[in-house]
Amino acid sequence: LGRSGELERITGIEKIFRLPIVNDWDKKGLGRKFFTFPDLSLGKEEQENIVAALQNLCKKSVFLVPDSQSADAIKQFYEDNLKDTKVFDAKDIEESKQPFVDSSAATVILANRFDGIDFSNDESRLLFIWNLPKTTNLQEKFLITRMGASKLYAERIRTRIIQAVGRCSRNPSDYSIVCVIGDTIQNDLTKQEKIKQFAPELRAEIQFGLENSMDYSNVNDVLELKIF
């Protein structure tokens, strides 16, 4: 956060001295991410089938959703269709995420959370991003959608996306599947003018995911990512 004046707006300080970035630090990410965008080739009617199939494949997952209403809907879906999978929310792991870690099959549903809780290594290899919004409050939403101030928040939105997709890959040897479902955040991950703003490694991972996702013809094609 710096090139667009984000720090100055947040703190109200006019002049901020910035420490230089370590060589190549801004060009590398933590771990590897296999992106999949099933909505690009499969209909929305397949979304629930994709979630169930990937959950059964990986057993443990993290679910990022926009609000508590969406969280309740996802929780109900798991209770109805994936009865052997334990469902946790932010309150359940507030003091410790160990109950989730110790479960053989589980998901943790986090509403409107871009950062703050990490799941490294085998804690979770699967991350669902479900209609996650680019804004976190009404003021940001108003300025972006009604006042045409999207450029002012472009850097902040990009940072949030980077934080969101990295919840399950927290060290250089870590890896995770990132399944993006819904239109809100997907637009920032599929448009070429937006993709080129990301670091080279993340940009390549997104591009690879886009190319693969265009050829899905059924849910089984999505499951081919188990090779990853």
Residue ranges with predicted function:
Residues 3, 46, 70, 153, ...:
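Helical mechanochemical/support elements of P-loop NTPase systems and associated helical scaffolds
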Residues 99-188:
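Conserved RecA-like P-loop NTPase helicase motor core
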Residues 171-228:
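Long, largely alpha-helical accessory region at the distal end of helicase-like NTP-driven motors
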